[in-house]
Amino acid sequence: MIRISDAAQAHFAKLLANQEEGTQIRVFVINPGTPNAECGVSYCPPDAVEDTDTALKFEQLTAYVDELSAPYLEDAEIDFVTDQLGSQLTLKARTPKCAK
């Protein structure tokens, strides 16, 4: 479903080390299926995990996706890119604005 590069996993692991134990990440889509759709990533503390979430286990972390966002995040890619201007996290999803 979602691919998270090694560089992005390392970046998230570094951030998660400063959070409450057991905190992971959540990948989501706001306003899925509309022209205003936006993808995002946030912290996901243990008490925020829902029974209906999909847990995607990676080498350094687990990413949770809610059931409404899941169809819109098929083949999504998260990367952490560094160049001469600095570093940035990128999230590319092909279908967040398409009706499913």
From Swiss-Prot:
UniProt entry tagged with the keyword Cell inner membrane: no
Family statement: Belongs to the NfuA family.
Record organism: Klebsiella pneumoniae
Cofactor: [4Fe-4S] cluster
Annotated InterPro entries: FeS_biogenesis, HesB-like_dom_sf
Name of the protein described by the UniProt record: Fe/S biogenesis protein NfuA
Taxonomic classification: Bacteria, Pseudomonadati, Pseudomonadota, Gammaproteobacteria, Enterobacterales
UniProt function note: Involved in iron-sulfur cluster biogenesis. Binds a 4Fe-4S cluster, can transfer this cluster to apoproteins, and thereby intervenes in the maturation of Fe/S proteins. Could also act as a scaffold/chaperone for damaged Fe/S proteins.
Gene Ontology MF terms in the entry: 4 iron, 4 sulfur cluster binding; metal ion binding
Subunit structure as annotated in this protein's UniProt entry: Homodimer.
UniProt keywords, alphabetically: 4Fe-4S, Iron, Iron-sulfur, Metal-binding
